[in-house]
Amino acid sequence: MSTTTNEAVTDVAAQRKAAVQALLADARTIIDEKGVTREALAAISARLLELATHRALFDSADFPPPQRDSGDTSTRYRLNPGEDGFALYLNSLLPGKTTIPHNHDTWAAIAAIDGAELNRIYRRTDDGRDPERAKIELAQEVVVRPGVPIAFLSDDIHSIHVGGAEPTLHFHLYGRPLETLTGRLGFETDTGLIVRYNATHMQRATQAVG
């Protein structure tokens, strides 16, 4: 790799880090001023949409999905590794990626750089008294794509479904790092069982980029 190429790569990495830190600073200010509310998450989502326009800083070549024959359907990149509190990830998903309905145990905001992801949003219809079982029903569907974000409070429930032929590249910003979310719940629609989502369904590996 030539000196000029090395300098260009270093420059992009520095610009990316600065853009990430600016986003996180803005998100902290929004939460400090508005609290954890849907209004605050809408403002954070708008800020994430702006970050997603800086495509040269988040090129899919630098954040590739898994190989199609690997057996995996997602790669998660942590953009502010080692930091406590807010955690920004870039998720690269292959077509065919799905999840069971789950909550997050913290707030979340999601915005797309590339690709479309169907989000099915659910509501609980039981009284919540049984810690092992729940009844949920589909309330809404939202296709997250460039220009169309989505956000969730900690108890909101959704599932994701990636169709089509092309991978996705989406920002996911959380109030706390995913690996710390021990109260995150998954909901098995066929049995009604509630499961610990991180323990049973979350891909543990995260690549640090920062």
State where each predicted segment sits.
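A short glycine-rich, His/Asp/Glu-containing loop-to-beta-strand
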Residues: 65-95
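A short hydrophobic beta-strand segment most commonly corresponding to one strand
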Residues: 109-111, 165-181
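N-terminal leader/capping segments at the start of a protein or of a new domain
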Residues: 1-56
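Short beta-strand His + acidic residue motifs that chelate non-heme Fe in jelly-roll/DSBH
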Residues: 100-101, 119-120, 152, 158-163
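Short acidic-glycine-tyrosine-enriched beta hairpin
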Residues: 124-157, 195-196
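Conserved short histidine dyad/triad with adjacent acidic residue
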Residues: 89-103, 153-155
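A short beta-loop-beta micro-motif enriched in histidine and acidic residues
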Residues: 82-86, 98-109
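Glycine- and acidic-residue-biased ligand/ion/polar-headgroup-sensing regions
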Residues: 105-123
